[in-house]
Structures are given as C-alpha cells and as structure tokens.
Amino acid sequence: MSKNPDKTTPATANAVTEQNIAADVDEVMRKYDRETNTRIWSGWRAIVIKVFMACFAVYCICMTLFSTAMPEIRLPLFMGFIILAGFLNFPASKHHVKPNYLPWYDIFLMVIGAACFFYFALNAMTMIRLATRIQPIHVAIGCIGILILVELCRRCVGLPILVVAGLLIVYAFYNQLSYGASFYKALQNIIYKLFYTTSGVIGTPVSVCYTYIVLFIIFGAFLERTGIANFFISFANRLAGWSSGGPAKVAVISSALCGMVSGSSVGNTVTTGSFTIPMMKKTGYKPEFAGAVEAAASTGGQIMPPIMGAAAFLMAEYIGIPYAQVAVKAILPAILYFTGIFISVHLEAKKLGLNGIPRDQLPKWRLLVRDCYLILPLVLLVWLVSSGAKTMSHSAAYSILAAIAVGLINFFTLRLRDTQTHTLRTVGKAAFSAAGDSAKSVFDSLEAGAKGAITVAVACAMAGIIAGCITVTGLASILINAVVQLAGSATFIGLILTMVCCIILGMGVPTTANYCIMASTCAPILIKMGYPLVAAHFFVFYFGIVADITPPVALAAYAGSAIAKSNPMKTGINATKLAIAAFIVPFIFAYNPQMLFENVTSVFQIIQIVITALLGIFAVAAGLEGYILRPMHWPLRVLAVIGGLTLLIPGTVSDLIGLVIVAGIIALQVMQNKKAAREAV
C-alpha cells in the first residue's frame, strides 16, 4: 500500500505555519507602514542599489563625525542624496510595482530633484549673500526642489503631513499678498525662506536628523541583526511568561525593549506582534485585546529610555538640554505608562481566569545568561551617553562598532554549536563562515539603516517647511493668543485643547514631524500659560505619540488588528483603554514637574508623586477593566475611575480622598470574596 501523499509531518506543518505568518507580516507592513512599500530589485540591479545605499550610510556616518562644512552645504548635500535614494526605493504607487523597473519619470524626478539641492550646496555662499534678492532662476530651482520633495513625501510618508504643509504654504502666500507684496515678490520671499535658509527644509529637524537620528537608525539596524530582538522576547518570556496571562505580559515587556530600538510603533507592532499576538490568542485573550496590547506596548517603545525614538533627539535640540537629560527625565513617565498596561493585562487575565505558560516550556536562565553579551552595544551606548565621555554622534559610532563585534561573535558561536567536534579545523571553518556572515550582516545593516533614514529625513524636511511657514506668518503668536483667551484662567482647559490639537495633527503623521509641529505651535501655548518648558515639550511629545493608537487613524492599532484578525476599531478602542496612562501621565507632570526631575526639593516628594500616580493609574485601569479581585458592577467601576483620577490631582486633600475611595472599593471586594467563599462551602 502506498503512503498517503497528503500526510504532513509536524516539521512540515510548522514550516507552513511560519511561512503563513511571514506572509501576513509582509502584507500588514505593506498596508500600514509606508517604509516597506519599496521597489523590488533582483540580480545585478539589486547589488548596485544595495551598494549605493550602503555607501550612503557610510557617507552619513563619516560626514556626521568628521565634516566641518557649514549647514548650508552639509544639509542640502544630505537632502540631495535622500532624494536619489528615495526615488530609487519608493515607487509612485504600491499597487503598480514592477520588478527591476524604474520609470522614466522617476529617473527625471530623481535627477532634477537631487540637482536642485546639489546646486544649493555648491552655491551656498552666493545664496547667503543674495538673501531675499535671489534671481528668478533661483526661485525656479527652489520651487522645483520643494515640489519634488513633496512628491517623495507622498510616497514614503503619507498625505496627512502634506495636507498640513500645503495649507500652511497657501496661508503663507496669502499672508504675503495681504501685506501688499506682488505675486512674484511673495513667491520669492517664501521660496527663499523655505528652501535657501535654515528656517525651512534644512531647518532644525533636518539638522538633528543628519547629526543624530540617522546614526541611531543605523545603530538600530545593526542591533536588530545581532539577534537582540529574540533575546528580549526570550528574556520577557522567562520573566513573566509563567504568570497569569503571561503571553500578554511578555508582549508588554518585549515590545517596550524592542520598541526603544526600532523607533517605529507600526514596525514594532508587526514584528514582535507576529510572535506575541498568536500566543495571547492561544492563551485565551480575545483577538481585539491581543492586538491592542501589542499596539499599546509597541507605541510606548518610543518613550522608553535610553534610545526612545527619533523625536527625543529633536526635543533635546528644541529645549536646549543634552539628550542624556531628556532620557533621564523620561524614566518615571515611561515606568508609569508600562505599569498601567501591565496592570490592565493582569486584571484582564484574572477576570478571564487565564493561566501562564508552563515553566518547562520557558527559556532557561542559563541560556539567557549565555546570550546576554548581545546587549553589550546597548550598555555601551548608555554608558557613553550618561557619562558624557563622548558626544552623541561618537557614542553612536562606537556602539555601531560594538554591534559589529557582537554580531561576529554571535555568528561564530552559532556556527560552533552546529559542529559536533571542536578541532582546530572545525573552529577555523566556523570562524571563516562567521566572518562571511558578519560581512553580509554589516552590508545589510548599512542598507537597512539608509532606507530607514529616507522616511525620517523627508518627514523632518516637511516639518521644517511647516515650521518655516509658521515663523513667516506669525501663526504661532495667533494660536497662542487664541488659546490663552479661550482658556482664560482655566489652565486645565488649555491642556485639554492642546491635547486635542496634538492628537488630531498627529493622526497619520510620523512622530518626528508631529513633534516638530507641536513644538512650534502648541508647546509655546503651554509655556505662555505658565507651564515649565520641559513639561510643555514632554506633554506635546506624549500626545503626538499616542495618536498612533487613538481612533479613527490609529495605525499601530490597525496593524495589530491585522495580525490578530480582529475588528480594527475595537482594537483601537482597546488600545486606547490599555494606554490610559499615556493620557493621564502628561497631566501629572504638567502640574508636578518633579516627575521629570524638575524643581525637586526632596526625594520624598518624588516618591509621594509616584506612589499616588501608581495607585491612581491602578484604580482607573481597574475601573475600565471592571475587575480588581472580582468583577465590578458599573457604579463601582465609575467610583474606581473617580477615585483614581482624584489621586492624580495634586494636593494632599485630593490624595487622601482618592485613597479612601480606592481602599473602600478594595475592602468591599475582599468582603464580597469572603462572602462568596462562605456561600460556596
């Protein structure tokens, strides 16, 4: 009798499952993350493109570390190469991508756009000398350069930021005409400001991107290829996988650790979610909840020190303090954010009666200790930045070298594990193979880092245009006066209005660009109302980030729902509930800047703020989940939320009132449990 041809082995089934998961991940990334909607190259064309991208990454590293040229030369050169790399990688539409094909119009746009920026770099001194008296040819070059940059932004960033930039450019043009300028003079002034000065395309956002962000994107690409993501997931599994609802807690911890490296909420949701979301569903969590947990935790990765995300470097520049101080100030808010998510997933697990992963299925501690060398580049970066031994750029460069060394060691150890006998010959062969693998990894990391830099650089350039328009028109002053008059003496209303602005403008806009817009418009409003500088910028930074999980345009939540096969809107609502701490914490440090280590008079002051904040977040999360020790009815849930919010209001009296409410609810739950136990007997 012949064997059944349809019979599949467990290994074959696992392979098919992994292929299906990989296909789902690719599909979701293409749908929600524009960075992955790139051209398809193969053969010699792929090699040429890879070499160009790797060389561009090396150019960025070398120019950042060693160049002494003035910004008007360095930054246009950088943007010229971004234009070249952008059109080589991003097609006009993701629906019409032909392998190994670059349309003639893309070649035209690529060459002309890059030429505009290179012309500026080569004639920088002339442009500075001419100032607003630039000639018609210069106006034409600036117009073409901006229009081609706008098209590249449409391809790799998206439409929302273009709508904002377009409206502001039209307003700036109208503003010039309203003061009596001719059509040409208005165009000349705007193009000069936006294209030929450091108040536009090559403004602070692009300068910070060129100086710091690109290096850290490249560092993140190297770090990911050392296998650190798998290490973080294994570590989170060992740490929390055994507890009630363990897979969800694993998702929170691993996404926090991986998210601070990747800097992309959507990308991190998809990559770590492809592992954690199926685990959560298998444990018993609803698909909407599983996708929401991953989205909320991955989004929080951008506020997780030490790397945080690209916007943190911009914040350091805008506030005028070292990046290390920004990272330190972000510690307590980040702890509160992830504690809030952790509490929510724990209460949900208890409510559903979910178990954890059996301990015998968890990674062994000895294996984790063996692989802990993978985090050495990250440890080195933290030490260099915190000690001030090196500049940020040099710290990133040294950390990249450390990541290369760790990658080589990792490849070598993996090759050795594959050999049964360790003779001189087998060790030499393993070393030779590891060197080859490491060289390929370095090449791939440089290419990935350069690709990642395109989207961020273009978003920063558009943010520079937006900031330039706001400066030219004086729109910031108008907004400040309008909000201050509307809020009056009710500063809390000012915070609410600012929060709404940040979330609306942040929908579909990359975090870097969103923060730049908020730093130019909304942060000055809060400062004018009397809030501290650092607290104001952290406030807009936080609400710019949570736009990724706030419906109706919650890209990270929708990416999580695609992996979980759940309803996108329900997933977004669940993600917002889980990340409730992100909506509360900014109000806490707005009224208590001590949480950001500002104006601290004693350690006990910080301890009191943190304890009351933790209790408040716990109570609010419990009220939203409807569970502490047992299910709660709606009146008790509302009371728990009120008690939690009362704890979050500054003041001893409010703290005591909130504490009494929360303690009373817990006491009631304890008594109800005892009564239920007696009745069961």
State what each model feature region is:
Residues 1-132, 139-143:
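Conserved, well-structured core domains of diverse proteins
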Residues 2, 6-47, 53, 328-452, ...:
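Long, contiguous bundles of hydrophobic transmembrane helices that form the permeation core
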Residues 38, 63-68, 89-100, 126-127, ...:
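Membrane-water interface regions at transmembrane-helix termini and the short interhelical loops
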Residues 67-68, 124-132, 188, 192, ...:
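Membrane-interface helix termini and inter-helical loops of multi-pass transporters
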Residues 136-140, 199-212, 238-252, 283-289, ...:
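Membrane-interfacial loop-to-helix junctions in multi-pass transporters
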Residues 147, 151, 155-156, 164-181, ...:
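Core transmembrane alpha-helical segments of multi-pass membrane transporters/permeases
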Residues 220-224, 255-264, 296-302, 463-467, ...:
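Transmembrane alpha-helix interface/packing and boundary motifs in multi-pass membrane proteins
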Residues 233-301, 307, 311-314, 320, ...:
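Hydrophobic transmembrane alpha-helices that form the pore/transport pathway of multi-pass ion
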